[in-house]
């Protein structure tokens, strides 16, 4: 039996999992990754600490399995997109990594919006503007930390950095870097005109070569092996953007299925074989790890992170108890609304979170119910836009932590009016990365591995009409917030 290691570096956790050649999970370990936020809007990560935590979870997952490190045939890494990790001329971390949820480039993005720069770069990159894009972060550093900017030797993203720590080889992986605004989507390569447009021309030479998801980037070094418990010489592949990894594990094959991810971010994805230039909505495209395919997705950090914050602030019991109590409430019966914008907004740049409609008879459970509803209402803006691009989509395959909550999934089915399928896969990031490792080591048919059971949720027509009324109240609430500042 052959075994494969999949590493998943997300917004709050890093995980390492071992799978056999059939995609069966053998062992998994995880650690929380601290986010450093010393100033309002900052979201940073200590790069040395990140690698140390990665090495620890690799060690732990090997140790708690019955598998020898020599039996691991290849390694893949999945990680969150955007953000920026910098190395100096000695290939040492140059300060902290800046994550995709960082908002320090707010004024720069706001200025670009006023200049209508989107009209110039969107036809090339098929990306929109975001504060956490590498180009936005780099422009901020150029203007505010010029000395650090001059010392940047290499620009990476999260899994590129971890891959470098394992192999000492420098690459940018295609599915992730294709959504950086440095990448010409139509030509499939970096474009210096983009760097010039964003005022960071110098950066184009600091981007390493691009590598595909299932191609071998390098081999585990003796130093990395000693730190992680691996053995020297194991192949490490390019890996995946975590949104792509999840879509891959959702086994999207046609325009009738969409993938919804609920985690730190709410993401709606679809897979297509062509760029549709007739659309008026600026859909975000990215490279997909299958020949001549693109992923299209809508996303914002308006998801379960809001619930996690509330639970931590008020030291609430476990999520099963919360689900049980919410299930006792009548759907859409409360007047309480929640804008899930603690970490960013999909309605207006800089819009913040908040409750509205609280009355004296409401309890903490009503607030939690409003958070559940608010996350789905916010998700609907992405889902409705994606249905414009994928009008035949009738089924949503849902992954992420909230997919374990039956009350939350039924709420999504009732609000959207769509059939839900919940794949019996808990670790899509790790599995997707491992699948790329399998492809590099042998010819593997991914669809056979992903031929798994799915739990079904069907919409309740009666609840749908009730939720529509509250959803329209939510939209009015968000519109009012837009005009507040």
Curated annotation (Swiss-Prot):
Pfam families given in the database record: FGGY_C (PF02782), FGGY_N (PF00370)
Reactions accelerated catalytically: L-xylulose + ATP = L-xylulose 5-phosphate + ADP + H(+)
Keyword Kinase: yes
Molecular function, one GO term: ATP binding
Entry EC no(s): 2.7.1.53
Keywords associated with the record: ATP-binding, Kinase, Nucleotide-binding, Transferase
Keyword Nucleotide-binding: yes
Top-tier EC class: transferase
Parts forming coiled coils: none
Family statement drawn from the similarity comment of this UniProt entry: Belongs to the FGGY kinase family.
Quaternary structure annotation from Swiss-Prot or TrEMBL: Homodimer.
Protein name stated in the entry: Probable L-xylulose kinase
